[in-house]
Amino acid sequence: MVFSYTEKKRIRKDFGKRPQVLDIPYLLSIQLGSFQKFVKKDPEGQNGLESAFRSVFPIKSYNGNAELRYLDYKLGEPVFDVKECQIRGMTFAAPLRVQLCLVIYERDGSAYNTIKRTQQQEVYMGEIPLMTDNGTFIINGIERVVVSQLHRSPGVFFDSDKGKTHSSGKILYTARIIPYRGSWLDFEFDLKDNLFVRIDRRRKLPVTVLLRALDYTNDQILNTFFNTVVYEFKDDLLFMNLVPERLRGETVSFDIKANDIIYVERGRRITSKHINKLKADNIIKVEVPLNYLMGKVIIKDYLDIKNGELIVAANTEISMDILHNLVKSGFNIIETLFSNDLDYGNYISETLRIDSTVTRFDALVEIYRVMRPGEPPTKEAAEYLFESLFFLEERYDLSDVGRMKFNRSLQRDDISGSGVLTKNDIIDVIKKLIDIRNGKGDVDDIDHLGNRRIRSVGEMAENQFRIGLVRVERAVKERLSLGDLDVLTPQDLINAKPISAAVREFFNSSQLSQFMDQNNPLSEITHKRRISALGPGGLTRERAGFEVRDVHPTHYGRVCPIETPEGPNIGLINSLSVYARTNKYGFLETPYRRVCDGKVSNDIHYLSAIEEGDFIIAQANTNLNKDGQFIDDLITCRNKGESGLFRKDQIDYMDVSTQQIVSVAASLIPFLEHDDANRALMGANMQRQAVPVIRSEKPLVGTGMERSVAVDSGVTVVAKRGGMVKYVDASRIVIHVNVNEISVEEAGIDIYNLKKYVRSNQNTCINQRPCVELGELIKKGDVIADGPSTDLGELALGQNMRIAFMPWNGYNFEDSMLVSERVVQEDRFTSIHIQELSCISRDTKLGPEEITSDIPNIGETALSKLDEVGVVYIGAEVVGGDILVGKITPKGETQLTPEEKLLRAIFGEKASDVKDSSLRVPNGICGTVIDVQIFTRDGIKKDKRALNIELTKLNQIKKDLGEELKIFESALFDRVYALLISSGVKKESLLDMNRCAWLNLKLKDITKQNQLLQLSHQYLDLKRIFEEKISIQYQKITQGDELAPGILKVVKVYLAVKRQIQPGDKMAGRHGNKGVISKINPVEDMPYDEYGVPVDIVLNPLGVPSRMNIGQILETHLGMAAKGIGDQINLMLQQHQEINKLRKFIQKAYKLGVGVRQNIDLNTFSDLEVLRLAKNLKSGMPIATPVFDGATEQEIKELLQLSGLPTSGQITLFDGCTGEVFERKVTVGYMYMLKLNHLVDDKMHARSTGSYSLVTQQPLGGKAQFGGQRFGEMEVWALEAYGASYTLQEMLTVKSDDVNGRTKMYKNIIDGNHMMEPGMPESFNVLLKEIRSLAINIELDD
């Protein structure tokens, strides 16, 4: 196996047996790919901005004398980069400029045909937020994610109510045509089997109204939907043209005979035998009695041959009179429609009878009345409305997806076609619905992933942009009609505000544009891969039923069956499976290996849920021989959503990987296959809540996915190109790029600036640390710096803790955990949290607020941490209530008493007209100030502190850019030096000269002289770029800030809070095994083993059997084995044993296992590399046990044996308090524990006095409102149950919300009089007012 430089430092032993056929794809491609489609120019105009422009332009004026054409668009460069936008609270966006052409026409006869004038102009159309490299958006300085939506695909869907609508249990069938844009069209049967249509879920109409509006007459309608039965009078006898198949299942009321042969006797039911006999004898006509014709329905209008009068209208039931009239008028052949009760219902015929419309105009008016109730219909308005509903491209669009789904549903050969509906489309849908009602065909499964598609960020942004463009279109049309065309320019016509507003509205306030979950790298990556069924055009929590939320067979390999939130959103918010991707139509696809004649190839095919239904697919854990052929004859496979046994020659495809069905978070749970699904769900969700700790530690037992997640999440720094580490410190890494990766015009230096102590969205700390050393050689793609929760380029959410499963004095009751004091001392779970506190200075009606250190009635001590401007120093340690930014607000003059006037006159005290509104540290928080940012409105003089901060920033930038320039110069002059030496210039003479003079030397060799000239130009360019960068940065830093109206100054103070683990904090493993810390126990009291090594955490063994998450036990055993191997290596290192011995032992550990795919040959490693590997393994050999393909029980035992530990995984423990041995052996091992972001510090809260609710006069609730306790309903019940009436009266009055009573009580207590006078509680007044609001007056007698 080939390892990268970083991987070689610490190789994870992989227990996976199945070959890795397909690498894990880039995990953020769903976000980046979709947005790329949106901003990238599409020459065909199918996607993105190009598609939106082409769909709206050209915009023509109402009278056709002018039009505005679209030519091209261009996205500019953003003014501020991502980091600057976050600091300044701005949106990371690029300006959109569009090339438009205004064409003015001249009247040529009756129409405008001749072009009079054209004018091209570039027009600004607002800003488009850009996606960062990690798939996020910076909106108003906040990092947000746009979640993909799983919505009902456009197309046609056939469904039924499953008999739930009516008490009779009759199944009513419906069809619904859903466009991508436009009106919905529903067809539905009622209880009487009449067929109705609804447009946009309005009042229903008989379906024949729609058909009549489509210009169908009664007989055309009947002929379209029914077969014809022809009856003929011959010699006073009535004959029927026979189609034998139609008689199946009928009981005949007469003998069917021909040529004197009786084929079916009267009263017999016609079977296949009779039909075959009739067909065999080629019987095409049979005699029928006259009464057989009674009640049959005529299929066409019969007109009098002489005068054209209507004798019988189509859809009339035949009676003797009608028959007599027809025969009398010379009609010997009578055509009726064919129907029966079994499989040819006469639904359309019955519907025609309840249809009151006669002409097309009647039908159009009826539709107009439904769509526009109250408006008087005219012929033109009714026609235009109907036309625009389904047949105009501007108003209706099925989209490519919709047309494809529509045509597939109707079994058409061609899957492409028009975006609008045609007559045939509507007719075919009605025909299929009638067929389903007749028992031919099935309804669709709406939860099938072939009927639900993914709408990603690019598509949603495009739709929103189109909405903005449509708003602009209306304004442009009006301006073209009203304005003076000779002076109008495209710039005058376009107002960018509606477009900006539409885009801003989407990114700021859409339900799918969400505040990014930035707890740790996994929560980031999961949030970006999330798929929501909620949001605009989707479902709502309240209306979503069980079926939509449930796992569907088509989710296999596309959507994770495990990871979904608990609570009201369960099943509505899902996560994308590891290998899933979307196809061009937006449907989810998953990869499979092609199987040919029982042999599995490495040919990968991606199949959507629709395509997958046709194939038989084997699972990834199916046994194969070396040639890739199936070993077993009968193999468990999936076909059409069901599992079954199939012969190996029947199989079409095989799964790519065992982890194909789960999401990223679920694939990080080792031994997932041994956990109950409910607990696995909790485990997957809780990993996302893990807080990054100060020192991340890789999991001893992992799944092999850790590296992919860490790299793809973007929190680590990955080398763009290979090379040698030239410089490294805590905040910067410089790499000298390999010669073969350098282009001619550049210096060949890559500089990586690391993030230091940045606040995340969840107030956790983002800090990057280099993991390379000076002089190391690295390759492209190597991890060169770790971020939060990563360790040597692997995801590290928690810590490996030595745990024991045993009860301990009741401290692990109900999932509690007993934790050793050593864990706290070693800072294993200590995390840093960064709080941002803002102080805003506004311009008020009474005058501007002022940020100052001169605050009235505040002592010197309280101001000791502020500078002269009134802003806290960096490095100050502050606690709750401390002033961070001093601020005074003007207040209105109050009427002064004579005494106050006298005092003011004597002492000249003027401070009373301002009040203290300083920013203070919230209660319960204590930390260190790590940064202060000051933003001042443009045009307002900056204070001393703001200028100092500016100066510091400028100096830092000059220093950084100067160092960058130095590095680039050094690299460039190295190349110049090499060139001059190779040209024969002496080394001594070069060293005596100034380096810049080297560039002016003249060389004999013309080629080398040209190269020197090129390097000289590069040097000048470097200098110029450096100067430009400094001037741009200077301008950015010194310019005023764009603040909201009325805001003069904003001061942001950043506090770093260090949180150690303490009782009340929530911790969890990866298997849904969560609990709260009950006690931090002294290390000497913890249970210890025979070597005196204490355990770190004691867990309750009763937490395992009922929860059925046995994965945690296996993880504990394997963790113990991994640590044992590390201990053995550590011992060898301490004894300074020779490298070969070390190499052999490590090689033996890596080789262990049956049929594992990993093949590591340590003989290819140098001694230095083996030594470095051993040093990294001494804390434990990291192990990967992939989901559904992990380590077996036997392999765990073998590893335990190799590490010299008992294979039972249990050891003898001693009580730390008494020193006595415990009665039986205890399961001890290493489990990866996470500290979750549910810290007791954030939840604990105390109050003595505080704010009250204005209405009820009771304390507010919750920590955020600094709330208190109220004596609530249930507490009242408790006192009532005890009959404690005096206590109850006291609680409900003076101790609660009797305002006067509690004031009197306070005075009485001060006076030493312990009497109480209960009054009227405020909540009783609320009740009285509620009752009065119902117009019932209640008055109380005194």
Swiss-Prot record:
Gene3D superfamilies: 2.40.50.100, 2.40.50.150, 3.90.1100.10, DNA-directed RNA polymerase, beta subunit, external 1 domain (2.30.150.10), DNA-directed RNA polymerase, subunit 2, domain 6 (2.40.270.10), RNA polymerase alpha subunit dimerisation domain (3.90.1800.10), RNA polymerase Rpb2, domain 2 (3.90.1110.10)
Pfam families: RNA_pol_Rpb2_1, RNA_pol_Rpb2_2, RNA_pol_Rpb2_3, RNA_pol_Rpb2_45, RNA_pol_Rpb2_6, RNA_pol_Rpb2_7
GO molecular function terms noted in the UniProt entry: DNA binding; DNA-directed RNA polymerase activity; ribonucleoside binding
A cellular component term, taken from the record's GO annotations: DNA-directed RNA polymerase complex
Enzyme Commission number, as recorded: 2.7.7.6
SUPFAM superfamilies to which the protein is assigned, alphabetical: beta and beta-prime subunits of DNA dependent RNA-polymerase (SSF64484)
Keywords recorded for this protein, A-Z: DNA-directed RNA polymerase, Nucleotidyltransferase, Transcription, Transferase
One GO term of the biological process aspect: DNA-templated transcription
UniProt cross-references to NCBIfam families, sorted A to Z: PRK00405.1, rpoB
Family: Belongs to the RNA polymerase beta chain family.
PANTHER family for this protein: DNA-DIRECTED RNA POLYMERASE I SUBUNIT 2 (PTHR20856)
Name of the protein described by the UniProt record: DNA-directed RNA polymerase subunit beta
